[in-house]
Amino acid sequence: MKKFFTVFMLAFGALTMGNTALADAPKQGEQFDVVAQPISTENPAKIEVLEIFWYGCIHCYQMEAPLNAWVKKLPGDVYFKRMPGLPNPSWAPMAKAFYAMETLGVAEKLHTPLFEAVHKQKTLNPTDEKAAIDWVTKQSGLDKLKVEQAFKSFTINTSLNRAAITFRNSGATGVPSLVIDGKYITSSTMSGGNEQALKTADYIIDNVRKDKAAKK
């Protein structure tokens, strides 16, 4: 009888834990949602995580440390990329700065320092394009004319248009937001914090992976 009771309690405990885990799982319409319109990804064979951000956003700045640590641990079937949000023209200077730094090959070096210039040193106005050009020129050590040409290039204007369309299609209501596999979106606001948003992203990634495997 004692043995039966022990087995029963273990089974009951496992069932209870399973139900609790299920209850705690992120829910569509709460911690995440389906994007307004599916977004094309660069590599359909893998799972894409797209961060939508703005250098002028303090929450995006605060997201940097936990996000970077999380990205380093992503499995091989997941890749990460960034895209500046562009819901209105005032965000364009920082979006141009991001794409210009990519074009000039200094994005990896200057991404975090640009955040810090805006939020830590408070020496850069994120809505001032001329100030952004001056900052990138000084920090990169590149010729100013080359930086100006990058900011005003046709390629970057094309990237800005694409970013604006992607932002609209994602249904994002703010930043930082994470779009997983071009189909699902979560954010710190939806999930209740930066760490929670990353946990929600993990949950979505796991389910997308299972869905891809089932379709093979």
How would you label these PLM feature ranges?
Residues 4-5, 138-216:
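C-terminal cap of thioredoxin/glutaredoxin-like
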Residues 2-89, 164, 168-169, 206-216:
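Extracytoplasmic thiol/disulfide redox context detector
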Residues 62-134, 203-211:
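Structural alpha/beta surface segment adjacent to cysteine/selenocysteine redox centers
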Residues 14, 117-120, 153-157:
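A short structural micro-motif
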Residues 46, 56-64, 87-94, 103-107, ...:
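Solvent-exposed, acidic/flexible segments
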Residues 54, 84-85, 120, 150-151, ...:
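Short, contiguous strand/loop micro-motifs
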Residues 24-35, 127-130, 196, 200-201:
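Periplasmic c-type cytochrome electron-transfer domains
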Residues 48, 75-78, 110-114, 141-144, ...:
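A short alpha-helix capping/helix-coil boundary motif
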